[in-house]
Amino acid sequence: MAAAALAKTLGRECAIRLIESEEIGTVGVGESTVPHLEAFNRALGIDEAEFVRQVRGTFKLGIEFVDWGRLGDRYFHTFGPIGHDYGFLPFHQYWLKLFLSGKAEDIGAYSLHSVAAQRGKFMTSATDVPQNSPLYYVAHAYQFDAGLYARYLRSYSEARGVERTEGRVVDVKLRGTDGFIEAVVLEGGETTSGDLFIDCSGFRGLLIEQALHTGYDDWTHWLPCDRAMAVPSEKVGPATPYTRSTARAAGWQWRIPLQHRTGNGYVYSSKYISDDEVHRTLMSNLDGHALAEPRILKFTTGRRRKFWNRNCVAIGLASGFMEPLEATSIYLIQSGIGRLINLMPDRNFSPVLIDRYNKQAAFEFERIRDFLILHYFATERRDTPFWQYCGTMQIPEQLADNIRLFRDSGRFFRDADEMFALPSWVQVMMGQRFVPTRYHPAVDLVPEQEVVELVASVRNVIARCVEVMPTHEQFIARFCPAEAA
């Protein structure tokens, strides 16, 4: 992704060299994303239908969460708006007045994305509707084979002048004067020098940590899962336009449908459950037969103390790790690339640019961290030691403030460029039974019948829109079917 974006932005004015090794494996079981990736691909000039075909992808309206608030609960966290603002207040405040008195359905009934996901419907947009129609543009993301996407972008990059070298980096040479990276040495002895080095070496942090000793902030006390067991399985039935996250005894299980198979995994805390028990649970909860042996990935949730150190910028897993609960992994890669392009240095490497990059990246990681913690903390589950810990742990103060504000009267304020906006917080809080005790007092200034009609009209418009949408499978079959394997 970094090579493709830099090649598109800088053209052939800068020499870009990509060093990677096919011998270093990846956990290729399917990747779930957020809508920002559509903009990234569009900036590269990639056709959406062609992209989905090449990566054997499906479309995503959001995530279904099962058993998180209580055993038996399920709700959707989707990408689109909830209703529409009325006056100066968000829709959910009017809905909340009726909901608290038993006169409205769950919040998902007022989200086009949620209703469409439940019914297996999908479309990207409609050309014959007014701009205020929910169908004018349907925010969406993708579910795809990450390995195929990487190969697709590799070809894209090489076609635009990126020089690819197959090999492993075995040594890093630092300048004696300032400790900047001068060159990397490959297995065969070849040396590659450069001005700026981007570390995409994953958890190892080959440059940012092993060479520059940047340091790492461990967040395991808030997000205790430290392993994932992943396995692909055969496709059974229509692919859903959403990812599923099912809470388990010591973590959660993902299900990501692709056109040709399904990606599955159990993210868990090794402190509370054994690998053998995870294996039994995962393998007994697959839709179809496993297509490979499960693989275990070990990780420590957290981030580098600096994302940009000297002349090295860490991108992706080299910069930090967030479990894939809200599918933020590729987003964080994309965001890091965009930030680097905006703050691209000259050979002087101004400390002002580096400092701003690090501050913005730290803010982004910490706000996403808090949103993930919310899922574990906002629960009534106490049925296992894992959930007993999560439901009673000390949480970051800003998250605690957000929860108190929402539970008081359903309010939330987004900070600056924080990734997750009001609809996300409303859906997760309500979905996991953190219900406000009251609504905004200004709602009472609107006649109750007007509130009833507003809420009902949103529900009715969504129902009519979903009715005319094709099924997810029909949409893929018409516009972007992958070639048979």
Question: PLM ranges: what are they?
Answer:
Residues V29-Q118:
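Dinucleotide-binding Rossmann-like beta1-alpha1 core, especially the glycine-rich loop
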Residues A5-E31:
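Glycine-rich FAD pyrophosphate-binding loop
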Residues N342-A485:
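Long, low-complexity C-terminal extensions of enzymes
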Residues A5, P130-L282, I337:
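Predominantly flavin-linked oxidoreductase catalytic cores and closely associated redox partners
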Residues R248-T300, A318-L332, L343-R347:
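Conserved FAD/dinucleotide-binding core of flavoprotein oxidoreductases
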Residues E105-F144:
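Alpha-helix-centered segments that form part of catalytic cores
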